C-alpha cells in the first residue's frame, strides 16, 4: 500500500509538469 501511495504522488507531480505543452514548445 505504501508503494502505491508513492506512485500516486509521482503521477500527480507529472501531471502538474504538463509534458505535452513542453513538447509542443520544443517543436
UniProtKB/Swiss-Prot annotation:
Positions of region (Disordered): 1-27
User: Has UniProt tagged this entry with the keyword Methyltransferase?
Assistant: no
Tell me where on the tree of life, at the top rank, the source sits. Answer: Eukaryota
A Gene Ontology biological process noted in the UniProt record is: spermatogenesis
GO MF entry, a single one: DNA binding
Q: Which UniProt keywords apply?
A: Chromosome, Developmental protein, Differentiation, DNA condensation, DNA-binding, Nucleosome core, Nucleus, Spermatogenesis
Please give an example of a GO cellular component term from this record: nucleus
Q: What does the tissue specificity note say?
A: Testis.
- Compartment list: Nucleus; Chromosome
According to its UniProt entry, what is the function of this protein?
Protamines substitute for histones in the chromatin of sperm during the haploid phase of spermatogenesis. They compact sperm DNA into a highly condensed, stable and inactive complex.
State the name under which the record lists this protein.
Protamine-A
What organism does the record attribute this protein to?
Answer: Acipenser stellatus (Sevruga)
The taxonomy runs: Eukaryota, Metazoa, Chordata, Craniata, Vertebrata
Amino acid at each position: 500500500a505504501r508503494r502505491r501511495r508513492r506512485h500516486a504522488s509521482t503521477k500527480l507531480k507529472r501531471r502538474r509538469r504538463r509534458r505535452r505543452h513542453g513538447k509542443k514548445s520544443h517543436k
